[in-house]
Amino acid sequence: MASNPKSDLLNCLSGSNVIVDGDEAWPDAIKRWTGYLGKIPAAVVQVTSEEDVIAAVSYAVQNQRPFVVRGGGHSNGFSTVDSPGIIIDLSRMRKVTVDVERQVVVAQGGATMGDGVKAASSVGMAVATGTCNEVGLIGATLGGGIGRLLGHVGYAADTVLSMRVVVVDQSGVARAVEASPDVNSDLFWGLRGSGHLFGVVVEATFRAYPWTHDTWHSCLVFPPSDAGLVAEAVEKVHYQGGMQGRLVFCAPNKQPIVLLQMWYMGSHEEAASKFQPLLELPSMTDHPLNFVGRRIPYPNLNDSSDRICGYGGRKNLAAFGLKNLSAGACVAALNVYMDFIVQHPEAAQTHVLTEFYSMDVARQLDQDGQETSIPGEFRREVKYWVMPLAWYDDPALDDACAGLNKAIREAFLTQHDGTRARGVGYVNMPFEDDTTTSVFGEGERLERLRNLKLKWDPLGVVQGIVKL
C-alpha cells in the first residue's frame, strides 16, 4: 500500500482531482453535513467521469484501501472513512438533463435534489425528491426515497427507469454496467431500495412528471400542552393525493413548541377543504411562525429546509416508520424531548420530525415485492416517518444525543398497555443499534439480497450503510 495515494491516483485518472491532508482544499474536501462520526481519509478523489470512478474504485481495491462514496455528504457515517481508506466524491458529477418528450430526467451520481428540482422545473416538469435541496438525489433514492411526490407516484425508487453502476468482480476489476428491467434486472431490483450494497451509481434515469401547480403550505403553532390533541387530529385524517405534513417538536429561543406543517401538491382550491379538520385546531394565531395558505413555486419547494440541511455543527439523524400515532405516545416523546432541552440547552436546535404522506399510491405499487427491494412494510405498515435530529456542537454531547434519539423512538413505540409497537427501520437513516434484520427484514427478501451481494460484490468491497 502506497504511503500517499495522490500521485498514484493522479496517474490513473483523466480529469479528476485528488486532495490529501496538507492541500489547501483539504478542509472543504472532508466537510460534511455533520461532524458526528466524521473520519479522516487518506485522500478524497473528486471524480468527473464514469471512467475515473472505475479507475478510482480499481485503485482502491487493488491497493487494499477501503472506499466510501460521497454524494451529498448528508449521512451520519456512511460517506466518511478513516485512512488508509479513500472517499470517492461525486460532487463534480452533478449534470441533470430533462427529455420533455420522453418525460425522463437523467441525473449524474453527484446531482443533488436541488439540481433535480431546478432542471425539471425549468421545463415545466417535476421529479421525485426528498425535502432537502443539498441531499444527494441518487443516494437517497437507493434506500427507497421518502419525499414530496410520494402521494402521487410512490417512493423515489419506484420512479427509476434505469441506472449505471460501477461494480467490482471476483478478480478485483471494476466496470460499469447498466441495470434496468431488461438488462441485469436482478441488480436493478436490488438497487431500487437497497442500492448502497452493490456499487457506485454514476447515473440514473427517473420518470419526470408535467407539473404546473404551486404548493399550498400552512404551519400551525401549538403549546406543548396541546400535543396530544394535535396527535389525535393528525391520526384521524386519511391523507390522499398531494397531502403531506410534518409534526415538529422544536425550541426556538429554547422554548419548546409543537408545529403542524401541511403541504398540498395540487389545486389550491382543494387544499383547505382536505386539511379542514387540522386547520380548525386552536393554534397560536399570533405566533410569528403560524400562517395559513402560502403558495410555494415548485422550484422553491425545499428552500425552507436550507438551514436544517446546511453543512456545519454536529447532527445525529435517524428515522423509523410507525403505523399509528397515539396522543399518549406523542406526549411521552415530547416530554423526553423537553427534558433533554432542559438538561442540554446548548443543544436546543434539536428537532423531532414526524412526517406523514398519502400512502394510497405506494400501497398499490409492487405489491409482491418483485419490482423493487423496498421493504413491503414501507408500503403496508408505515403511515408516519419519525426522525429525531439531535443538533449540537460539543463532541462531549455525542453519547447523550445518540441516547436521545433512541429514547424518542422508544417513547413513540411504547403503547398504553406497556407493549412495544413494531418500528420499521430505514436504511438511509439507521439508528446506531439497527441491525441487518431490523433494516432489511428476514426470510426470502434477505436471502435474495445476500445472494445478489455475492454476485455483484463478491469481494465485499462496497461497504453499504447497514451491513448484510
From Swiss-Prot:
Disruption phenotype: Accumulates astechrome instead of hexadehydro-astechrome.
Coiled coil: none
Pathway in which this enzyme or protein is active: Secondary metabolite biosynthesis
Top EC class, one word: oxidoreductase
Gene Ontology MF annotations: FAD binding; oxidoreductase activity
E.C. number: 1.1.1.-
Cofactor: FAD
Function: FAD-linked oxidoreductase; part of the gene cluster that mediates the biosynthesis of hexadehydro-astechrome (HAS), a tryptophan-derived iron(III)-complex that acts as a virulence factor in infected mice. Within the pathway, hasG converts the prenyl to a methylbutadienyl side chain. The HAS biosynthesis begins with the synthesis of a tethered Trp-Ala dipeptide by the NRPS hasD.
Family, as annotated: Belongs to the oxygen-dependent FAD-linked oxidoreductase family.
Protein name, entry field: FAD-linked oxidoreductase hasG
Gene responsible for this protein: hasG
